[in-house]
Amino acid sequence: MAVKKYEAGVKEYRQTYWAPEYVPLDSDILACFKITPQPGVDREEAAAAVAAESSTGTWTTVWTDLLTDMDYYKGRAYRIEDVPGDDTSFYAFIAYPIDLFEEGSVVNVFTSLVGNVFGFKAVRALRLEDVRFPLAYVKTCNGPPHGIQVERDKMNKYGRPMLGCTIKPKLGLSAKNYGRAVYECLRGGLDFTKDDENVNSQPFMRWRDRFLFVADAIHTAEAETGERKGHYLNVTAPSPEEMYERAEFAKELNMPIIMHDFLTGGFCANTGLARWCRKTGTLLHIHRAMHAVVDRNPHHGIHFRVLVKALRLSGGDHLHTGTVVGKLEGDRASTQGWVDLLRESFVPEDRSRGIFFDQDWGSMPGVFAVASGGIHVWHMPSLLAIFGDDAVFQFGGGTLGHPWGNAAGAAANRVALEACVEARNEGRDLEREGKDILTNAAKDSPELKIALETWKEIKFEFDTVDKLDVVNR
């Protein structure tokens, strides 16, 4: 048997990591990157460089390569595609053997795929557009603590989306006044209320005081309405120890659901908290604070659909997804694409919705999509048409901004939702007939009538920054 000779020096990445003949294995983790190379760096070399730097490569040949099977462990750039309307960038498809990654560790996957390679000088900009997690890897992750069906059973709510509200002002209220707002919203007809993402434990409202007043509000509202209620108590904290202390106290108070800011808190903390929630029977609401820092630039960063997949693997029962019709970024096709990635067991490749790979989730539970941000009663027909039943519609200002107060705002939203669900079940076109559906419902609901008058002129007519690059294949 001939001995492979070690040859020192620097060689082009394409010699090792460009493999257009490679057929990805079912067990490979596949990634699609949008690459904008530096002037003078051709596509194959740039794609191979990304494959190398995100897997086994370094800038020079090293003799220790001979101590392992580099052909097995290396990432392979196996396909390149044009980006429609952009002649400076291209899509590179890279396959990684599953054994490069620790089982069940979103942390480890991201450390490789979006690690040092994003500072690599050979590329001017780099964006991770999509990742295919093979079923063999999905099964190593715990996923959502409970999922959609179990949450419906716990909350005893079926046949419609859930209604929520983020308490406003998000900062500055005392714990007692905060609890009062929670009670009024839940008594008025909402299923959930919510801490905003930056409500932790500030001088004006320490976390323990907030938890106590909120628990009292929930128990009182449940007794008065006969319905199960919840409030997303944010347990995000400066350290894991403090996070678990807050979660444990929420459990002591018999709170059904807690909340975590999964990006600012980190995937390690989130996965640990999701496992705790599964063990204790606690639901977990996930906020995506900080996502736009990494996903809004269409040329550099990580697309939100990748963060969606990562969250489903790491664990959460709810995730904020944008609204399409509200104040936050997100076009309809893309949003419905990542909502399916949250909820469905199998999602086929669909470039018209920005989905680059088939994604098989096996039996992993789905996650409720949370529509939140600048929505009000006039949006209800479109929200139901876009998101369907397995969603939470959260009206912050659209509840608390009602001229008659919080309970009236909650009642208006509940009446609007139930009218739209009834119309949908009758086969009516929600988006075409939405105005008639709401105005007819308002004849028997003065709260809804006032809400419709208050927000009839409110629109968010801004174009989406991150547009789909639809590939004609």
UniProtKB/Swiss-Prot annotation:
Supply one GO BP term: reductive pentose-phosphate cycle
Q: Which residues bind substrate?
A: N116, T166, K170, R288, H320, S372
Which named protein is this?
Ribulose bisphosphate carboxylase large chain 1
A Gene Ontology molecular function term of the record: magnesium ion binding
Entry EC number(s):
4.1.1.39
What is the native source organism of this protein? Answer: Acidithiobacillus ferrooxidans (strain ATCC 23270 / DSM 14882 / CIP 104768 / NCIMB 8455) (Ferrobacillus ferrooxidans (strain ATCC 23270))
List, alphabetically, the Pfam families matched. Answer: RuBisCO_large (PF00016), RuBisCO_large_N (PF02788)
Describe the reaction catalysed, as an equation: 2 (2R)-3-phosphoglycerate + 2 H(+) = D-ribulose 1,5-bisphosphate + CO2 + H2O; D-ribulose 1,5-bisphosphate + O2 = 2-phosphoglycolate + (2R)-3-phosphoglycerate + 2 H(+)
Q: Tell me which residues are marked as the site Transition state stabilizer.
A: K327
Q: Which cofactors?
A: Mg(2+)
